[in-house]
């Protein structure tokens, strides 16, 4: 495909803002069209932008674009194992097993909803303890992260538990490092690794997480039986023992560790950050917050929590949550590569070429959304105020590599968000007005996080 002429050594890196690659890619698409070639250093990459092109690639050509490329930092961490950056039979088997295990553990079912209500209770008690004084947005993270941990480890943590706090800190530090331009440079020029420290710091932190995970794996090994599969770790270890005489079982220690690590990382940051954004956007737009609270008041019985099923009677709230996920473009893109030689929209893409399907360009596609750069819940409502599904709503990606935890994330987000707004009104801290809340320059980590901000939670009568 067409694209800018690469310079020696740097390729087209001078045209890309590494902190907001997604914005740079959309700008280049205006000049070169929805499919173009870019050079990151010596790496040739094909970029796909806009709803039509990205959806066609991920849905109609799902087998062709199913692989992940080799990325130096993830090669060093996972060595081709796990869920996120594995390919081929290892990926297919691990993913299939993970999806069925998570379903058996209640993902997307009512049993997990009970856990979410329990966690909501703890979160609300925590927020009440601030007594209306300002607290930071990451204070919300403990609840959604605990839901993921309960599925992985078999039980929730107390919010003051030292292991819980250590894991939260390490995940946070790893996510921040993943957004660092230096890490990008290491991925483009791994042979210059000796010049960069970031990847070494990162590998050390990942090892600190593994030390904790090994303790849980050891405990699970010691008392596992088929009647006591209480967690994802239990399920993996039970599967490993089932296949221990199988010569080329894919459930070896390295793949088990990599899979758990992927779930710890990807299954926590995304939902926690989305919840932070949802509260920040309610602080920014108090009239939208009020309309959500009015709908909750009409629909949910006083003294009980909204269930996920209630969303069908809460079109405005449902639209607001969808718009939060569209507007924040949380995970701008995760690279793919072609599994086979591929002909796509008149272009030949050889096997193994890196492909970037830009999810940001879909969520902000001006042919699909009336006001793509504004927070506007009407994107998901018809003239009568009914909720409307939109094909271009793809924050979880789509096709064979879509997000494994999508059904869990949607349920958590709805139950937590509604429960919080049922109990509190969220306002900026004293001396800060709605217009002071900056949404335009997110913090680039593995995801796009809101800038550090504080909120005040005022208890509702």
Ranges and model annotations:
Residues 39-46, 106-118, 127-150, 158-166, ...:
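Cytochrome P450
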Residues 144, 148, 153, 205, ...:
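Central I-helix of cytochrome P450 enzymes
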Residues 103-107, 145, 180-181, 205-275, ...:
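Conserved cytochrome P450 catalytic core segment spanning the I/J/K helices
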Residues 266, 345, 383-413, 440-444:
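Cytochrome P450 heme-thiolate "Cys pocket" and heme-binding signature region
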Residues 286-288, 406-446:
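Cytochrome P450 heme-binding "Cys pocket" and the immediately downstream C-terminal segment
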Residues 1-16, 21-115, 134-136, 140-149, ...:
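Cytochrome P450 substrate-recognition site 1
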Residues 357-385:
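Conserved cytochrome P450 K-helix/beta-meander segment immediately N-terminal to the heme-binding cysteine loop
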Residues 13-26, 30-33, 211, 215, ...:
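Conserved cytochrome P450 K-helix E-x-x-R motif and the immediately C-terminal K′/meander segment
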